């Protein structure tokens, strides 16, 4: 088939047929789009606690007391204290083998990471296309204007103001707030040629719904140390391992995919 196309091109394009062949070569070398959705489980192995402990608390706090707009209105000092501590924890943490393993896949794939995590471990591991669904702990913003966003590595205090005069708050999407990046994430998922879920059990929405936006019939994988059965994990390759171990296994499974997708 390729020889027939080659001869047809040679006849049709004449001296331009080498250009045609070069275009075919570029198409064959185009990296396949690998979309990865990551959750708290991938950063847990770097020492960052998951969103809920077994007792239903988050770093010893009730979610409602530190991660909702109502909490911010009721006790902003407590909220700032909570996120200041989390920021320190993130700065002390280091990317683990799962983070670096996903970054290494960029050698063979066009990797897009969509993360529910607010840390920067994907970026520090070398990932170049990272979309943060729930905000970033190393950024802060005006409480009145979500377009006024600033980098930060220190604490935020009551009285710290944005340029519009409003109090600065963590650049985090709290519970009961809309998820601004969800539409962009849906678009990315819709272009996937392979979809991988790491460190999340697919029970927290709207992020869990992203898998449904991936094209039907593409290779799909889920990596987590404990995967509950839900309709979301049907027709998907399950790797029930911790993220660091599972991403290593994934690398082997993806070796042939870069040519066969």
Stretches with model-predicted labels:
Residues 14-16:
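Compositionally biased, low-complexity intrinsically disordered regions
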Residues 10-11, 26:
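Intrinsically disordered, low-complexity segments
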Residues 2, 20-261:
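Conserved catalytic core of sirtuin-type NAD+-dependent deacylases
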Residues 4, 11-12:
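Polybasic, lysine-rich low-complexity intrinsically disordered segments
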